[in-house]
Curated annotation (Swiss-Prot):
Regulation: Inhibited by Ag(+), Cu(2+), Fe(2+), Hg(2+), V(3+) and phenylmethylsulfonyl fluoride (PMSF).
Active site, renumbered: 232 (acyl-ester intermediate), 325 (charge relay system), 357 (charge relay system)
Cross-referenced InterPro entries: AB_hydrolase_3, AB_hydrolase_fold, Carboxylest/Gibb_receptor, Lipase_GDXG_put_SER_AS
Locations listed in the record: Plastid; Plastid, Amyloplast
GO cellular component: amyloplast
Protein name: Tuliposide B-converting enzyme 1, amyloplastic
Length: 440
């Protein structure tokens, strides 16, 4: 089926990226000759349109004026994160928002949270979020070190979803947040991300005596209440740092949000999603070439060689699980193991039914973003059924399908917004040492 028959009207947008510890020039992807698409993502790339409106791809994905066959032949497909071509070229797809529209650190008028960027003593970039303090006593803000998600391959501390989310969290929890911009695979395979995050955490903790590099942390940070947290890959990082003997001894609590765990033997819920199952079977070895496999304790804390979770020395722990998330069953099993082995207070499990992986990062989607997401889902569904290149879909059929899909996504966004508010309520309670509602 020619993809042009039903998505030629989709929005065009600029393409560019920022990753790791630097910025590449943003460029427009050269026009590519229309040809038959084998997948929705390929269709989007051919028509200068990404999964999310104006989502960016890296500069090194742009074809040279005279591309060789190896520039377009796929070696490894890790959609929705990236694609590696036989030439070695990496094409990042980006998961949320406009990859060219990174948010500058600044005062956020809506939350009155101020942010600024800094570099640690070992060269790791971080972004610091300071809630409105007014006449607050010195060192009265609890401290959270946050690790963003993105499969260790994409995202950034300046990505709009993370910047907006952390502004909101800093304001509602009245907590000082340091978001770590760790280096990404495959350019920097694991354990580089673990090392960067550990270095950043220890750098933050050096401010506990008031003589650190950043005056905001020196003046306002309460290091009797130090927390670490992250979502997806960041949840994995949180677990691995908490297990390490190099972690500070004064961590009060950890919060794992939809943590990225996997294993050699697929769980029942994972077998029900063959697309994600195949993706994750390829992912770990790509980001960790030196790994011993999918039962590596760093990705499978439930595996046969995984150490006891009693190594986690903090006082409190909470795990968040999304009911429709591919990783949900492992998150629950991790929580069960934590309850049997953790030596601190009884760990909490917060289960959110009916929502998917890191849903809380996209609850404020614009009408344009909803339409783009609907178009993507529509393409995914259609390509499952139409394999013949000669099939042409009439515009009226396409518009009807798109309208139904858009309405469905709008309803889902309403559910996600309600669950996101519940998650925020639970996190605020956890960080402030209060009973966490709706937890088990």
């Amino acid at each position: 089926m020619s993809i042009v028959s039903f998505c030629s009207s989709l929005p065009a947008g600029p393409h560019g990226f920022k990753h790791g510890r630097g910025t590449r020039d943003m460029v427009h992807m050269p026009c590519i000759v229309r040809r038959t698409a084998r997948s929705p993502a390929q269709a989007c790339r051919l028509l200068r349109w990404n999964k999310y409106h104006c989502a960016a791809v890296p500069t090194n994905s742009s074809l040279s004026p005279s591309p060789t066959p190896l520039d377009v032949e796929i070696e490894l497909d890790l959609e929705p994160f990236l694609i590696k071509y036989k030439s070695g070229r990496i094409e990042r797809l980006g998961r949320f928002g406009d990859r060219t529209d990174y948010v500058e650190a600044s005062l956020d008028p809506a939350t009155e949270v101020t942010s600024r960027d800094a570099i640690t003593d070992t060269g790791v970039p971080v972004r610091i979020y300071l809630p409105k303090v007014d006449d607050s006593p010195p060192n009265s803000l609890r401290v959270l070190v946050y690790f963003h998600g993105g499969a260790f391959l994409v995202e950034d501390s300046a990505s709009p979803p993370y910047h907006n989310y952390l502004n909101n969290l800093a304001s509602k929890a009245n907590i000082l947040i340091v978001s770590v911009n760790y280096r990404l695979a495959p350019e920097y395979p694991l354990p580089v991300a673990y090392d960067d995050c550990m270095e950043a955490l220890n750098w933050v903790n050096k401010h506990s005596d008031g003589t650190g590099q950043e005056d905001w942390i020196n003046k306002h940070g309460d290091f009797d209440h130090l927390f670490i947290s992250g979502d997806s890959a960041g949840g994995n990082i949180t677990h691995n740092i908490a297990m390490s003997t190099d972690a500070p001894k004064n961590i009060e609590g950890i919060a794992l949000v939809h943590p990225y765990f996997f294993g050699k033997v697929a769980l029942e819920t994972e077998l029900q999603d063959p697309t994600n199952l195949l993706l994750h079977r390829k992912l770990w070895s790509f980001i960790t070439p030196e790994s011993e496999g999918l039962d590596d304790p760093r990705v499978n804390p439930l595996g046969p060689t995984a150490p006891s979770l009693e190594k986690i020395k903090c006082k409190r722990a909470v795990v968040f699980v999304a009911g429709e998330d591919f990783h949900s069953e492992r998150g629950r099993k991790y929580s069960e193991k934590l309850k049997s082995e953790f030596k601190g207070e009884v760990p909490l499990l917060c289960n959110h039914d009916g929502v998917g992986h890191v849903y809380h990062l996209s609850v404020d989607a614009t009408e344009e973003e909803i339409e783009s997401a609907a178009a993507w889902k529509m393409m995914t569904d259609l390509l499952k059924f139409y394999k013949d290149n000669d099939v042409v879909l009439e515009g009226s059929i396409v518009e009807s399908l798109k309208a139904k899909t858009t309405e469905g996504i709008k309803k889902m966004k309403e559910i996600e917004k309600g669950m996101s508010e519940r998650m925020m309520e639970q996190l605020v309670a956890f960080y402030n040492g209060k009973p966490v509602p709706y937890s088990s």
